[in-house]
Amino acid sequence: MYDYMNDLTNQVQNFNKMLTLLKYRGPDDFNIASSEHVLLGHCRLSIIDLNGGKQPFKYTYNDIEYTIVYNGEIYNMNTIKEQLIDEGYHFTSQSDTEVVVASFIAYGPRCLNLFDGIFSFVISYQNKLFVARDQLGVKPLYYYQKDDLFIFSSEIKCILMYLGRCVVDETGLKELLGLGPSVSPGKTIYKDIYSLRPAHYMNVFNGYKEINRYWALERRNHNRSYEETVHDIRCLVNHSIRQQLLSDVPVSCMLSGGLDSSIITGVTSQYISKLSTYSVDYQDQDKYFQPYEYQTTRDDHYIDEVKTLYNTKHKTVTLSQKQLVMSLKESLIARDAPGMADIDSSFLLFSKEISHNHKVVLSGECADKILVATHGFIEKNFTVLTAFHGCVI
């Protein structure tokens, strides 16, 4: 929370209540940093540097204090850290949080082009804010502005609590009904509440905001042969998965038996012995399953083959219809908007079960979209847009 003109110290109690709504996102730690014009709060899920990465994190350089609240992970943090050390920066922790704030001090907004990872963060310094979101918008970041007041949050519900009201935005609602469960980048279904767009950053100063884009997808002609393309994808997938194994807590994998999760499990098992894997099933699924064009059989035997091949420690979570129905409201509240009904509730329940033993789980959810493998993309009557033809974007 930031207010250029007004004293926010009388808002600490209310701010604390707002932050409490996010404790389920980060149950390991809960802290607030307050000053006259800025309140920063953080609920932490400890993954890297369990003791040294507490937030809000303060870093002092040239007698200027920088305070950051950060959600995400920078996979190439060690490379960036070595570069910063060579340039004279000092570190007191092993966390990527400190690397992010030091990178901003050293390079300004250009630091965002160095980060290979997923992130959203706010840095406060000299009564100014720098706010940023990762290239693909994996990590959420919402904001509200009225006059000199700005509120930022990972979830909309905190902003709604402060406002004490909920006004639906007509355009956002139309988009939700037409594009559901999504709306166009930057929009939400609530009036005056916005999402910072992926690959954008915001400077806030003197009660004003300035938003800029720092990265964009590039269109490039794809001239590689089939064999070269297979090799390239194999290298990229291996590199991506290996980077995401950076963790000070155990890592697990979701395993559905499909290509995506099976590949992730196979690669991960090269680096983690006796890997834990999880699958979800539904009560009486064997009785009611109906084969169709894109899934002719149940996935059980594929799961069995993969878990046996890689010798994983496997657990299947079985959900009942009643459980799915009963968790619909909770999944709706978690999303702060209507979503994908039973898909949301089943994923919520599945994730809860995994969280009893693991904080980190790798998933192949939506990975098939990268290579347009979903059936909606391969219908015979699907029209290929000229802009995408023969290109890798």
Predicted regions and their residues:
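Residue-level signal for short amphipathic helical patches enriched in basic/charged
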Residues: 75, 338, 357
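Cysteine-centered catalytic environments shared across enzyme families
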Residues: 1-334, 347
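Long, Lys/Arg- and hydrophobic-enriched amphipathic alpha-helices
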Residues: 335-343
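Active-site adenylate/phosphate-handling loop in enzymes that bind or generate adenylated species
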Residues: 135, 147, 259, 286, ...
